[in-house]
Amino acid sequence: MRMIDIIEKKRDGHTLTTEEINFFIGGYVKGDIPDYQASSLAMAIYFQDMNDDERAALTMAMVNSGDMIDLSDIKGVKVDKHSTGGVGDTTTLVLAPLVAAVDVPVAKMSGRGLGHTGGTIDKLEAIDGFHVEIDEATFVKLVNENKVAVVGQSGNLTPADKKLYALRDVTGTVNSIPLIASSIMSKKIAAGADAIVLDVKTGSGAFMKTLEDAEALAHAMVRIGNNVGRNTMAIISDMNQPLGRAIGNALELQEAIDTLKGQGPKDLTELVLTLGSQMVVLANKAETLEEARALLIEAINSGAALEKFKTFIKNQGGDETVIDHPERLPQAQYQIEYKAKKSGYVTELVSNDIGVASMMLGAGRLTKEDDIDLAVGIVLNKKIGDKVEEGESLLTIHSNRQDVDDVVKKLDSSITIADHVVSPTLIHKIITE
């Protein structure tokens, strides 16, 4: 088999066999196939696309290029959730203890964040003493005992994806549905999930700006999952404004605690209940979405979800008293109110710009080596559709420096106030095939 033949075959619009895809991925990881041939094939895929069988084969070739996490010692159906990312996306922090409270095992492998704010692990590390460096045996034991544990990414998972992703980044082949879908799904499958719930974001603060693109990606990932024996479904949710009100690590953790108490923002609560209901059904803990939703609401109202979060924090060395004493979380030195320059209704909150503003305060990383300030960030006091009076606070800047003129300038271009009301949509579609 020759790589040049595989490139020409895809260039001319033909279907690649599983053997050809395995030959490419295997050879590329070993270094037998050079970057220039891999980038040539990536560009051919970009223009000629792949069918469902090719996408599934590419995903599994990347899964098999490295280690797979074995979660077979954990009792029950392991359901994982993946979000394509957004601003203020606190769902994992709420979902993990919430679904665990209704007996769904959550064995979560998470990373650190690049971009607007930290990842799930950075947010949890805002809790004094919390650690994620636990061995596999302890991880399995914690999930079996308490139904939830979070561990840092370790081992040699999907090395082919890491290599191909870096190549796509510099060869103009990032925005290819088969390449994005196989990249995301290979990581989820290698992490040991039996079933997968996907939260595909669309809008100004999302990777997929249009609903059409988000749908195409959601369908692609759901089909890959179902084709390789993992029950998979996707929700397409809106990221035209940040989710919830908090953007920043300790601030988002505080918001997660409020949500588990039943006092969280409406949009975050609704998205968590929608995603959580799907997870509960896939884990065979409820027969219908309505029944699953009722179980989750009861877990919040009874305090079981909050109690689960406390035990989870304690199990991983953290100070669980932060649940009742949020002032023990990292606090920024200055709170600066950003006020409305006129009266009207909020019609636009550009997620990316608000994310960048929080990053300028120190809440996110530009490179893996950067330190982040867990205390800083932005809290939205108004969301799209809210009425606002001139001089009223639109948002609060939590900062460890007094001069935030650069941040204010960024925010000036990210908020629009008009004289008409806009009603935002939160959940656009649910995709099951």
Swiss-Prot record:
Gene3D superfamilies: Nucleoside phosphorylase/phosphoribosyltransferase catalytic domain (3.40.1030.10), Pyrimidine nucleoside phosphorylase-like, C-terminal domain (3.90.1170.30), Transferase, Pyrimidine Nucleoside Phosphorylase, Chain C (1.20.970.10). SUPFAM superfamilies: Nucleoside phosphorylase/phosphoribosyltransferase catalytic domain, Nucleoside phosphorylase/phosphoribosyltransferase N-terminal domain, Pyrimidine nucleoside phosphorylase C-terminal domain. It holds the Pfam family PYNP_C. Keywords: Glycosyltransferase, Metal-binding, Potassium, Transferase. One of its GO terms (cellular component) is cytosol. GO terms for biological process: pyrimidine nucleobase metabolic process; pyrimidine nucleoside metabolic process. Its EC number is 2.4.2.2. PROSITE patterns: THYMID_PHOSPHORYLASE (PS00647). Binds 1 K(+) ion per subunit. It is an enzyme of class 2 (transferase). Substrate binds at R168, K187. It catalyses: uridine + phosphate = alpha-D-ribose 1-phosphate + uracil; thymidine + phosphate = 2-deoxy-alpha-D-ribose 1-phosphate + thymine; 2'-deoxyuridine + phosphate = 2-deoxy-alpha-D-ribose 1-phosphate + uracil. Its cofactor is K(+). Phosphate binds at K81, H82, S83, T92, K108, M109, S110, T120. InterPro entries: Glycosyl_Trfase_fam3 (IPR000312), Glycosyl_Trfase_fam3_N_dom (IPR017459), Glycosyl_Trfase_fam3_N_dom_sf (IPR036320), Nuc_phospho_transferase (IPR035902), PYNP-like_C_sf (IPR036566), PYNP_C (IPR013102), Pyrmidine_PPas_bac/euk (IPR018090), Pyrmidine_PPase_CS (IPR017872). One of its GO terms (molecular function) is thymidine phosphorylase activity. K(+) binds at G88, T90, L243, A246, E255. Catalyzes phosphorolysis of the pyrimidine nucleosides uridine, thymidine and 2'-deoxyuridine with the formation of the corresponding pyrimidine base and ribose-1-phosphate. Homodimer. Belongs to the thymidine/pyrimidine-nucleoside phosphorylase family. This is Pyrimidine-nucleoside phosphorylase. It comes from Staphylococcus aureus (strain COL). The lineage of its organism: Bacteria, Bacillati, Bacillota, Bacilli, Bacillales.
